[in-house]
Amino acid sequence: KGCVAIVMLTPLVEEGVNQCARYWPDEGSCTYHNFEIHLVSEHIWCEDYLVRSLYLKHLPSGETRTVTQFHFLSWPNDRVPSTAKPLLELRRKVTKCYKGHNSPVLV
Protein backbone atom coordinates (compact mmCIF):
# COMPACT_ATOMS: atom_id res chain seq x y z
CA LYS A 1 0.00 0.00 0.00
CA GLY A 2 1.25 3.44 -0.88
CA CYS A 3 4.25 2.16 -2.87
CA VAL A 4 6.10 4.91 -4.74
CA ALA A 5 9.22 2.98 -5.82
CA ILE A 6 9.69 -0.18 -7.88
CA VAL A 7 13.03 -1.95 -8.33
CA MET A 8 13.07 -4.21 -11.37
CA LEU A 9 16.00 -6.64 -11.54
CA THR A 10 15.37 -8.39 -14.85
CA PRO A 11 15.13 -7.36 -18.49
CA LEU A 12 11.78 -7.78 -20.22
CA VAL A 13 13.18 -10.48 -22.53
CA GLU A 14 16.28 -12.58 -22.03
CA GLU A 15 17.57 -14.96 -24.69
CA GLY A 16 14.20 -14.79 -26.43
CA VAL A 17 12.22 -15.69 -23.29
CA ASN A 18 9.80 -13.23 -21.68
CA GLN A 19 10.93 -12.49 -18.12
CA CYS A 20 8.49 -9.73 -17.16
CA ALA A 21 5.36 -8.11 -18.54
CA ARG A 22 5.80 -4.56 -19.79
CA TYR A 23 3.27 -2.45 -17.91
CA TRP A 24 4.43 1.02 -19.02
CA PRO A 25 4.37 2.73 -22.44
CA ASP A 26 7.43 3.59 -24.55
CA GLU A 27 6.01 7.10 -24.61
CA GLY A 28 2.73 8.79 -23.75
CA SER A 29 0.06 6.76 -21.96
CA CYS A 30 -1.38 3.26 -21.93
CA THR A 31 -4.04 1.38 -19.98
CA TYR A 32 -2.99 -1.73 -18.08
CA HIS A 33 -5.79 -3.51 -16.23
CA ASN A 34 -7.43 -0.85 -14.02
CA PHE A 35 -4.64 1.72 -14.41
CA GLU A 36 -3.84 4.47 -16.85
CA ILE A 37 -0.05 4.77 -16.94
CA HIS A 38 1.83 7.77 -18.29
CA LEU A 39 5.58 7.69 -18.88
CA VAL A 40 6.75 11.02 -17.47
CA SER A 41 10.49 10.50 -17.99
CA GLU A 42 13.15 7.89 -18.58
CA HIS A 43 16.81 8.51 -17.73
CA ILE A 44 19.73 6.16 -18.26
CA TRP A 45 21.93 6.73 -15.21
CA CYS A 46 24.68 4.37 -16.31
CA GLU A 47 25.05 1.21 -18.38
CA ASP A 48 23.73 -0.85 -15.45
CA TYR A 49 20.38 0.78 -14.74
CA LEU A 50 17.84 3.37 -15.78
CA VAL A 51 15.18 5.28 -13.90
CA ARG A 52 11.61 5.87 -15.09
CA SER A 53 9.02 8.18 -13.61
CA LEU A 54 5.47 6.89 -14.10
CA TYR A 55 2.24 8.73 -13.35
CA LEU A 56 -0.52 6.25 -12.48
CA LYS A 57 -4.25 6.75 -12.30
CA HIS A 58 -6.42 4.04 -10.76
CA LEU A 59 -9.42 4.21 -13.10
CA PRO A 60 -12.16 2.94 -10.76
CA SER A 61 -11.27 5.34 -7.92
CA GLY A 62 -9.55 8.19 -9.77
CA GLU A 63 -6.63 8.03 -7.29
CA THR A 64 -3.31 9.16 -8.78
CA ARG A 65 0.29 8.61 -7.80
CA THR A 66 3.77 9.11 -9.21
CA VAL A 67 5.95 6.00 -9.03
CA THR A 68 9.67 5.76 -9.73
CA GLN A 69 10.91 2.57 -11.36
CA PHE A 70 14.58 1.65 -11.03
CA HIS A 71 15.36 -0.88 -13.77
CA PHE A 72 18.59 -2.85 -13.28
CA LEU A 73 19.91 -3.88 -16.70
CA SER A 74 23.05 -5.92 -16.12
CA TRP A 75 21.98 -9.02 -14.18
CA PRO A 76 23.25 -11.94 -16.29
CA ASN A 77 20.86 -14.73 -17.24
CA ASP A 78 21.02 -17.86 -15.05
CA ARG A 79 23.86 -16.65 -12.82
CA VAL A 80 24.88 -13.97 -10.38
CA PRO A 81 26.70 -10.78 -11.42
CA SER A 82 30.50 -11.00 -11.41
CA THR A 83 30.64 -8.00 -9.08
CA ALA A 84 28.14 -6.50 -6.66
CA LYS A 85 29.28 -2.92 -7.34
CA PRO A 86 26.52 -1.95 -9.85
CA LEU A 87 23.81 -3.48 -7.66
CA LEU A 88 25.14 -1.68 -4.57
CA GLU A 89 25.21 1.60 -6.53
CA LEU A 90 21.58 1.04 -7.49
CA ARG A 91 20.70 0.32 -3.86
CA ARG A 92 22.39 3.58 -2.79
CA LYS A 93 20.45 5.49 -5.45
CA VAL A 94 17.12 4.00 -4.33
CA THR A 95 17.93 4.65 -0.66
CA LYS A 96 18.96 8.25 -1.38
CA CYS A 97 15.82 8.97 -3.41
CA TYR A 98 13.43 7.50 -0.85
CA LYS A 99 15.11 8.28 2.45
CA GLY A 100 12.43 9.41 4.88
CA HIS A 101 9.52 7.94 2.93
CA ASN A 102 7.24 5.69 4.89
CA SER A 103 6.08 3.65 1.90
CA PRO A 104 7.44 0.25 0.84
CA VAL A 105 9.74 -0.33 -2.12
CA LEU A 106 8.45 -3.07 -4.43
CA VAL A 107 11.16 -5.41 -5.76
Swiss-Prot record:
PANTHER family: IA-2 PROTEIN TYROSINE PHOSPHATASE, ISOFORM C
Record family assignment: Belongs to the protein-tyrosine phosphatase family.
Alphabetized UniProt keyword annotations: Hydrolase, Protein phosphatase
The UniProt record lists the keyword ATP-binding: no
Cysteines paired by S-S bonds: none
EC number: 3.1.3.48
Pfam families (alphabetical): Y_phosphatase
Swiss-Prot/TrEMBL GO biological process terms: regulation of secretion
Organism, as annotated: Styela plicata
Entry's Gene Ontology molecular function annotations: protein tyrosine phosphatase activity
A GO cellular component entry from the record: secretory granule
InterPro entries: IA-2/IA-2_beta (IPR033522), Prot-tyrosine_phosphatase-like (IPR029021), PTP_cat (IPR000242)
Protein name per its UniProtKB record: Tyrosine-protein phosphatase 1
Chain ranges of the Tyrosine-protein phosphatase domain: 1-107
